[in-house]
Curated annotation (Swiss-Prot):
NCBIfam families tied to this protein: Q_tRNA_tgt (TIGR00430), tgt_general (TIGR00449)
E.C. code: 2.4.2.29
Record's keyword terms, sorted: Glycosyltransferase, Metal-binding, Queuosine biosynthesis, Transferase, tRNA processing, Zinc
Binding site for Zn(2+): C306, C308, C311, H337
Active-site residues, as the UniProt record annotates them: D93, D268
Residue ranges, annotated region (RNA binding): 249-255, 273-277
CC cofactor: Zn(2+)
GO MF annotation: an example: metal ion binding
Cofactor note: Binds 1 zinc ion per subunit.
Protein name according to UniProt: Queuine tRNA-ribosyltransferase
């Protein structure tokens, strides 16, 4: 993987990732949003439909694919690309967040994590080394180190111990990745909770080990938005300028804008797909809740500014009808629209950075959705 930083507008960065894959070179324009394909599918969508929304890279879930269908099935198809028939780049998370999500079902030790398989109930063990081996078999283009996602709230001592263990796990991940002679990219993950001092130690420790890119983890786990913005604004300047920066598990459209304002290049979130299935649809001026009875007879498209298949062909009344009847097509059309909304937003962001008018774009974006522009920490401190 090669990263090229092309231009900036304030702290916003316009870049390009290039991946060499068996079917040729693949380019990902950044800032980029990655749809989530937890079980080897973006729910309800074919790979061709996902690509048609403008997505250039997907996220797969190491933990879930390891449990089902397992490494052997994956290897029998070549890798995850062959299994799901997506031939562009794939980033896989390490399983750390899923382990964090299991709560009482897991036990964390220095060696790794023992937990109860949520499918079969048996005890299984996941370590930094095992995570690197699974991701190698998945053929991931971007491999994530195995870490502990520090919960919120966490005391300073808990966050410190968790971050220090994640740093040791980062080194073990790096070593096993190199032993496997994996030709792909490996990203480190900054932890440290909401404590700037710990974030600094984590970022510096990861840079010392050396990675192809750096993620900011442990955010969007329940902390107030202001806290997320503060930690993000503090952390990104600590990361190398010439490497991509990834904000994990974020988020709402305004979260993407705020991440880019603070120097982030990559995002992923289940929000556009999950919200689509629940009738929450993102449009240029906010959100349409398609289950509202006022749309029952609405003959207008979802978003007149949108060029997706759904908006070009169907009315709100039809989408309301499909949702009311529980038709699968409704969820699919909603998903197509929400994913396209996110990709259009990223394209608009990239263009604004190229034209060095990103600050103006931010003002216009918030004006459209009827919200105030959140201040940057640097502005608050003046």
């Amino acid at each position: 993987m090669k990263y090229e930083l092309k231009t900036t507008s304030g702290n916003a960065r316009r870049g390009r990732l290039t991946f060499s894959r068996p079917k040729g070179e693949y380019v990902v324009e950044t800032p980029a949003f990655m749809p989530v394909g937890t079980y080897g599918t973006v729910k309800g969508m074919t790979p061709e439909e996902v690509a048609a929304t403008g997505a250039q890279i997907l996220l797969g879930n190491t933990f879930h694919l390891w449990l089902r269908p397992g490494q052997e099935v994956m290897k029998s198809h070549g890798d995850l690309h062959g299994f799901m028939q997506w031939h562009g780049p794939i980033l896989t998370d390490s399983g750390g967040f899923q382990v964090f999500s299991l709560g009482k079902l897991r036990k964390i030790k220095e060696e790794g994590v023992t937990f109860q398989n949520p499918i079969s109930g048996e005890k299984i063990f996941l370590s930094p080394e095992k995570s690197m081996e699974i991701q190698y078999d998945l053929g991931s283009d971007i491999v994530m180190i195995f870490d502990e996602c520090t919960p919120y709230p966490a005391t300073f001592d808990y966050a410190k111990n968790s971050m220090e263990m994640s740093l040791r796990w980062a080194k073990r991940s790096r070593d096993r990745f190199d032993e496997l002679q994996n030709p792909r990219a490996l990203f480190g993950i900054v932890q440290g909770g909401t404590y700037e001092e710990l974030r600094k130690i984590s970022a510096e420790g990861l840079v010392d080990i050396g990675f192809d890119g750096y993620a900011v983890g442990g955010l969007a786990v329940g902390e107030p938005k202001e806290e997320m913005h503060r930690i993000l604004e503090f952390t990104t300047p600590l990361l190398p300028q010439d490497k991509p920066r990834y904000l994990m598990g974020v988020g709402k459209p305004e979260d993407l804008v705020e991440g880019v304002r603070r120097g982030i290049d990559m995002f992923d979130c289940v929000m556009p797909t999950r919200n689509a299935r629940n009738g929450h649809l993102f449009v240029s001026n906010g959100i349409v809740k398609i289950r509202n009875a006022k749309y029952k007879t609405d003959t207008t498209p979802l978003d007149p500014e949108c060029d997706c298949y759904t908006c070009k062909n169907y009315t709100k009344a039809y989408l309301y009808h499909l949702d009311k009847c529980g038709e699968i097509l409704g969820a699919r059309l909603n998903t197509i629209h929400n994913l396209r909304y996110y990709q259009r937003l990223m394209a608009q962001i990239r263009q604004a950075i190229e034209e060095d008018r990103f600050d103006d774009f931010v003002v216009e974006f918030y004006a459209k959705i009827g919200k105030e522009v959140p201040p940057l920490q640097s502005e608050v401190n003046k």
